[in-house]
Amino acid sequence: MTTIIELPEVLANQIAAGEVIERPASVVKELVENAIDAKSSQITVEIEESGLKMIQITDNGEGMSHEDLPLSLRRHATSKIKSQSDLFRIRTLGFRGEALPSVASISKLTIKTATADAEHGSILVASGGKIEQLEAVSTPVGTKIKVENLFYNTPARLKYMKSLQAELAHVVDVVNRLSLAHPEIAFTLISDGKQLTQTSGAGDLRQALAGIYGLNTAKKMIDISSADLDFEVGGFVSLPELTRANRNYITILINGRYIKNFLLNRAILDGYGSKLMVGRFPIAVIDIQIDPYLADVNVHPTKQEIRISKERELMALISTAISESLREQDLIPDALENLARSSTRSFSKPEQTSLPLQPSQLYYDPQKNDFFTKETVVSEDSPQGFNHETLVDSGVKQVDNLQLAKTESEAAAPSVKYASRPDPMLSDGEHPGLDVHNKQKLSQMLDRLENEEQSVFPELDYFGQMHGTYLFAQGRDGLFIIDQHAAQERVKYEYYRDKIGEVDNSLQQLLVPYLFEFSGSDFINLQEKMSLLNEVGIYLEPYGNHTFILREHPIWMKEAEIESGVYEMCDMLLLTNEVSIKTYRAELAIMMSCKRSIKANHSLDDYSARQLLLQLAQCKNPYNCPHGRPVLINFSKADMEKMFRRIQENHTSLRELGKY
């Protein structure tokens, strides 16, 4: 009797589903790719409970015949390749014939479909991979696939699903990537009856970018274009001033397929050269057209990994295209835009604001116990408002022509203003930023800071500054050189550590609320983690699609820090999958102290420098910044005398060496 048997087809499909269908977003990806292959111009994705309860994909594509419909649930049955040679010239997104049978094997599946030349359509109902119903039905041309109770017969997979918000964020990300890959298709994503994403299908990639990432982002994207005998490279990349804290905003497309490729990511960063800050990444959509013979798609069932011939040549082409496009741009940021952002952040509501012009000198306010810059205030008329949703949903306006007439209802509405992200080029280069991914290093840093003991600081008499970076002071033990950035970073850290730890209900109302704009997936992820922001006194409320409004701020946060501070907190929160409020507060204090401190090459007047030393003396540990760097070094009087050879080393006698 043989011990090797051929597995039943349903069981084989469930095994295949383990690789192909990882989560609800995987189902959305596979079914939408099928709709794209069917030459659809409109695709609607509807989900309930993040896709675990229901996923429905409706398209207006070619549809399937009554005879082909049951064959579509057979494993490795496909209309996209017919011979071995076809495997090396694949132009469709699907070709393996695994997705639909895999989905059917772990859910209840209903398919309604019709072709243009058929007298009637067809309906198929399957449960657990077994066909229960197949009959004629009246239905529009195209296909509607409904997936219900996903993973109902694979409880182990269901057990390891993340929260509904996290799964929804993955679905939004998949639809966004496919929308960028195919701007000629009108995509709509509806979750629990609420529309989350809609693109016009006008074929304008910049307009698709505006619908997904927002108008502010789309306006700061520049197009790239280059080609050689094997590749055509196009798309959009962000200006160096517009970056993110991770690579999630980089989208690489090959022949309309979204892929993941480390080397091509590296080529994009190389195209920016030194224009990017360390640890910052651009927003990019790189569309690559390639001869199918040069790309092997048959690497993994998810088809997100591709082996590319002449990969080095493609990397060089991408880097050159980006660097040349950046070279043609005026990379000097507009001063008024950097300071006010009024022209790019107030397009749904009018705005009134004043623009501080920052000089190079810092001053100290003894009443507020903090540093400030003398400001020249420039008044500016409120710009015309324009409607974000109307622009994206209608598909008839271009991003470059954004102004619409201000209506009476808009004029009567309370003023709000879009917050601007911090410019990474203005961040300090004193030391690498806080690496929240390095859990071991982060834990060691937090333990060291938590166990600090009170230190005694010497009395110092300030007498000068060098290169706008180092302060000189003398004391009983000689000369002291103080790193002004590290010194104020320590002062700020202990301030924020105490204030954030004492967060209560003390909030200050904002005269003009701020709007904070995020991508769809980030917006959903932040909603899930909003309790952590609430714990530190930040209360963001949803305000339209992909936007939060901030109406009040904690009293420990200065109003000048709100825009950049809230964005920095949100970016850090998005980078950390799981974090305790204690750890989050500690990380937040370190980050804010670094961002808010005096930088190198910044002149201090004598009074401000002396006040900084007085504040430093009051710190629990005045000798190290939160990252562990020394705040000050000391040359004793004896050290100075040795350096100037005022003290001669005694000659060591032979008797002292023990020879006699």
Swiss-Prot record:
Keywords: DNA damage, DNA repair. InterPro entries: DNA_mismatch_repair_CS, DNA_mismatch_repair_MutL, DNA_mismatch_S5_2-like, HATPase_C_sf, MutL/Mlh/PMS, MutL/Mlh/Pms-like, MutL_C, MutL_C_dimsub. The keyword Repeat does not apply. This is DNA mismatch repair protein MutL. Transmembrane segments: none annotated. One of its GO terms (molecular function) is ATP binding. This protein is involved in the repair of mismatches in DNA. It is required for dam-dependent methyl-directed DNA mismatch repair. May act as a 'molecular matchmaker', a protein that promotes the formation of a stable complex between two or more DNA-binding proteins in an ATP-dependent manner without itself being part of a final effector complex. Belongs to the DNA mismatch repair MutL/HexB family. GO terms for biological process: mismatch repair. It comes from Streptococcus equi subsp. equi (strain 4047). GO terms for cellular component: mismatch repair complex. CDD domains: HATPase_MutL-MLH-PMS-like, MutL_Trans. Coiled coil: none annotated. SMART domains: DNA_mis_repair, MutL_C.
